[in-house]
Curated annotation (Swiss-Prot):
Primary localization: membrane
Taxonomic superkingdom: Bacteria
Ion transport found in the keyword field: yes
Protein name: Na(+)-translocating NADH-quinone reductase subunit D
Gene: nqrD
Protein source organism: Aeromonas salmonicida (strain A449)
Organism ancestry: Bacteria, Pseudomonadati, Pseudomonadota, Gammaproteobacteria, Aeromonadales
One Pfam family it belongs to: Rnf-Nqr
Length: 210
């Protein structure tokens, strides 16, 4: 059983110290596609966190029964099943956002963060720590996603969660939205700045030269 300090470490380290996007550079593709609005980024964060946490939990529970030769297939089967459940829940209760996310919910199965934590952590750890590790990595992923979405939506649309923050010229205000920030490549630059900021703040995270 994990103690409180270990639980705290499992939850916070992926957010602050070992972020899956900022440090490990995993899960970048979805960060380009779903961060033009806060609503889609928030729902994607919840979806990835749920899949990562519960896939870690279930894989940890059956880890001793999985033959080593088929462990990847077993992990993929668990992850795919959870992705289907999440996709159907979104279609049932958040249909409009589900349409905006399109295929990207289904593509969670290919997200390196989910598969990476299942293989690197859940296959070697007890269920509760594995579940917390999944939540922590989902939150770390979401922290970057929501930061990128905040910048893109405010500067690209003048809104945040659909609420107008900057008065638009179309409505008699002063702000002219920067449409470039609504294009997927803008997320690359913002993520690059986040990575630069994180590694400048903590030089230990800079990759060693060959």
């Amino acid at each position: 059983m994990a103690d409180k300090s270990e639980m705290k470490k499992l939850l916070l380290t992926p957010v602050l110290g070992n972020n899956p996007i900022a440090l490990q550079v995993l899960g970048v593709c979805s960060a380009l596609a779903v961060t033009s609005q806060m609503k889609t980024a928030f729902v994607m964060t919840l979806a990835v966190t749920a899949v990562t946490a519960f896939s870690n939990l279930f894989i940890s529970l059956i880890r001793n029964q999985i033959p080593n030769s088929v462990r990847i297939i077993a992990q993929m089967a668990v992850i795919a099943s959870l992705v289907i459940v999440v996709d159907q829940v979104l279609k049932a209760y958040a249909y409009e956002i589900s349409k905006q996310l399109s295929v990207f919910v289904g593509l969670i199965i290919t997200n390196c963060i989910v598969m990476g934590r299942a293989e690197a952590y859940a296959m070697k750890s007890a269920p509760l720590p594995s579940f917390l590790d999944g939540i922590g990595n989902g939150l770390g992923y979401g922290a970057v996603l929501l930061t990128v979405a905040t910048v893109r939506e405010i500067l690209g649309s003048g809104t945040w969660f659909g609420i107008e923050l900057l008065p638009l010229v179309n409505n008699g205000g002063w702000y002219v939205p920067n449409g470039l920030l609504l294009l997927p490549p803008s997320a690359f630059f913002i993520i690059g700045l986040i990575i630069w900021g994180v590694r400048t703040r903590d030089p230990k995270q800079v990759e060693a030269k060959d």
